[in-house]
Amino acid sequence: MGGLQPWHWVIVIAVFVLLFGAKKLPDAARSLGKSMRIFKSEIKEMQSEGKSDNPPATPITSERVDTNPTAEQPDKRSA
């Protein structure tokens, strides 16, 4: 009990053959293999990008420009 017996695997395989048909199973396995290869290559690429020697980008500082008219500037509406 608790573990899968060999006859459990036979039943699982029989259900897959009945659901998908014998012709579609090789294509499904092939596409699953391709997907796994692509996934693994993307994971390796992401890990290599994380270990790059580039220093972290410095934040860009900017000055704030006040767009409200001040008392020093004459009001254009009253002229």
Swiss-Prot record:
Keywords linked to the UniProt accession: Cell membrane, Membrane, Protein transport, Translocation, Transmembrane, Transmembrane helix, Transport
Ranges of Basic and acidic residues composition bias in the record: 43-52
Location within or outside the cell: Cell membrane
GO cellular component, one term: TAT protein transport complex
Gene Ontology molecular function, alphabetical: protein transmembrane transporter activity
GO biological process: protein transport by the Tat complex
Topology in membrane: Single-pass membrane protein
TM regions (residue ranges): 1-21
Top-rank taxon: Bacteria
Stretches the record annotates as Disordered: 43-79
Function: Part of the twin-arginine translocation (Tat) system that transports large folded proteins containing a characteristic twin-arginine motif in their signal peptide across membranes. TatA could form the protein-conducting channel of the Tat system.
HAMAP family for the chain: TatA_E
Subunit structure: The Tat system comprises two distinct complexes: a TatABC complex, containing multiple copies of TatA, TatB and TatC subunits, and a separate TatA complex, containing only TatA subunits. Substrates initially bind to the TatABC complex, which probably triggers association of the separate TatA complex to form the active translocon.
Family note: Belongs to the TatA/E family.
The protein's name in its UniProt record: Sec-independent protein translocase protein TatA
Originating organism: Mycobacterium sp. (strain KMS)
